[in-house]
Amino acid sequence: MPNETTLQAVRLEDLELVGATQADSAMDTRVNFPFSPEFPATTGIELEGGHNVVYFELDPGTELGTHTDSPEELIVCLAGSAVEVWIGEARGTIRAGELTVIPPMVPHGFRNGGPETARFLGFFSDRTTVTEFESPVEPLGVAVLRT
């Protein structure tokens, strides 16, 4: 008998988002790693494959500060019209409907320069992601996150 599969859908607007800030930067984001049991607001669903997912939002004028991630990351911009992105020395702007690829361990960040809330889905190429920020992220109190 084949394995029984059930549909497990997660509505992005239903995710419990955790506010994340840094004292020494304009970082002010809301984030969820929906399939990571290590994250405080997990959905309880765990992925079986070798990947991980992040959802985050940036209000106008706020940023997700410079950080590195251990695996490669594919970012999909779901909403937003003028999101500044830095990946290593490269600089550019993305908007809703565009993707960008971030190599492993390359410093990168995002700043919402547009008038509306920007929303993103990020897909990591490894099940475990180690993210390192330049300074501690509150309310977690750490600069290195493992999800």
Language model region names:
Residues Q8, R111-T147:
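Double-stranded beta-helix
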Residues T68, E72-A96:
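A short beta-strand-loop-beta hairpin characteristic of the jelly-roll/cupin
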